[in-house]
Amino acid sequence: MTKRALISVSDKAGIVDFAQELKKLGWDIISTGGTKTALDTAGIKTIAIDDITGFPEMMDGRVKTLHPNIHGGLLARRDLDTHLKAAQENGIELIDLVVVNLYPFKETILRPDVTYAQAVENIDIGGPSMLRSAAKNHASVTVVVDPSDYERVLAELTEIGETTYETRQALAAKVFRHTAAYDALIAEYFTAQVGETKPEKLTLTYDLKQEMRYGENPQQAADFYQKALPTDYSIASAKQLNGKELSFNNIRDADAAIRIIRDFKERPTVVALKHMNPCGIGQADTIEKAWDYAYEADSVSIFGGIVVLNREVDKATAEKMHPIFLEIIIAPSYSDEALAILTNKKKNLRILQLPFEGQAASEIEAEYTGVVGGMLVQNQDVIEEKADAWEVVTERQPSDDEKEALEFAWRAIKYVKSNGILIANNHMTLGVGPGQTNRVASVRIAIEQAKDRLEGAALASDAFFPFADNIEEIAAAGIKAIIQPGGSVRDQESIDAANKHGIAMIFTGVRHFRH
């Protein structure tokens, strides 16, 4: 009996060559619409789908393959006489191979000018139905959704006359992943269209971006996936200009770095980061000077760190960065001279180019945190804060210079692991105390880092001070300006201690925990 293949593809790459090889092997080919036209034009004889169904394609192509003569030919079990008898009695011929890929829904909704009606018209119905029918009956039917599998299928058909069960099962698994992701994307689009923020079912679809050597540690397997609808301002979308492949830890650190610099848009700024914590942030009138400040902030911790700059890297800045061992540099652009300097004898230095225009859109994405047996979903910690809404709770008002330092420190503290303390002046961080289990320990670490540079400095705390002992430590170091959320039942004790030492203290009313 002659084997039959049904081919209906939107992505026609390689399909003519594939069909020609099938014909050489003696297969009949059933086809539809544009695919049939392409194959006929190439001189490949095909059978029209309506010759199988007895019905013409109708309703602008919405109805063409949803017919028992198609799905019966796909779903009939070859090992059951009752199925084969039913097919014979109803004039249904068996279909042994299905090659289908789907309407380009993703590509359609990514177009900036797409209309709702256009999106709806690009939801494939018949394609997924054929794929699922064939995949369900993979014991007998080969199903191909990815052109990269053409070669594998042809090789087996040529060598042994059929595909192996292992191949059919693997291809069926790929189909079910593909149709699930396709439907998830449609669900995501419709959920956004109706403004639903707490769907009872959460379906996310991601594409494999990079197979990784290992995860956070060598004993952990890992891979990197990118959202099916890519975010422009993201590490997954960055263009790598130089260096080794990004590691798991590189990606996490780089993501943290580009989040931080989103909050420093107005002036040239450089952020240095290590293990998800900023170790130096500098801002100035030029990117070169901002680098100077970021490096000066902590010239020890920056070794082996990640640096992100929010302006083009110029020659002068590159010359200063080149001698320092860095894992990654990220910037919106690089001058030709700067790139030549940075790559000279630095083949392993990872240099990424990232378009900063997409920052605002990246801020509205939800954050997903995996826990054993579940997942937490929250908005990013992005909130517009205005200094004139803050409250000075002490007798002494901060000076103008202190106000600038307090505002700078408050922007930066948001990205320090809790319990987090950060000391800064108006243009650079001076000391960072991250991730301690009690706040006074974080205060001591930050002060120790900044101890020789505390003149005119301000201190920020990501959450309230639970006891006045923190204020006593800060006062003993000579710091005269503090910014914190407030909200402790013992706030008055902290205020009294600040007043006793002549410290100006601001309550923002906004907490910035970071776990």
From Swiss-Prot:
The keyword Hydrolase applies. Keywords: Hydrolase, Multifunctional enzyme, Purine biosynthesis, Transferase. It catalyses: (6R)-10-formyltetrahydrofolate + 5-amino-1-(5-phospho-beta-D-ribosyl)imidazole-4-carboxamide = 5-formamido-1-(5-phospho-D-ribosyl)imidazole-4-carboxamide + (6S)-5,6,7,8-tetrahydrofolate; IMP + H2O = 5-formamido-1-(5-phospho-D-ribosyl)imidazole-4-carboxamide. Residues 1-145 form the MGS-like domain. Pathway: Purine metabolism; IMP biosynthesis via de novo pathway; 5-formamido-1-(5-phospho-D-ribosyl)imidazole-4-carboxamide from 5-amino-1-(5-phospho-D-ribosyl)imidazole-4-carboxamide (10-formyl THF route): step 1/1; Purine metabolism; IMP biosynthesis via de novo pathway; IMP from 5-formamido-1-(5-phospho-D-ribosyl)imidazole-4-carboxamide: step 1/1. One of its GO terms (cellular component) is cytosol. One of its GO terms (biological process) is 'de novo' IMP biosynthetic process. Its EC number is 2.1.2.3, 3.5.4.10. GO terms for molecular function: IMP cyclohydrolase activity; phosphoribosylaminoimidazolecarboxamide formyltransferase activity. It comes from the Bacteria. Belongs to the PurH family. The IMP cyclohydrolase activity resides in the N-terminal region. HAMAP family: PurH. PANTHER family: BIFUNCTIONAL PURINE BIOSYNTHESIS PROTEIN ATIC, BIFUNCTIONAL PURINE BIOSYNTHESIS PROTEIN PURH. This is Bifunctional purine biosynthesis protein PurH. The gene is purH.
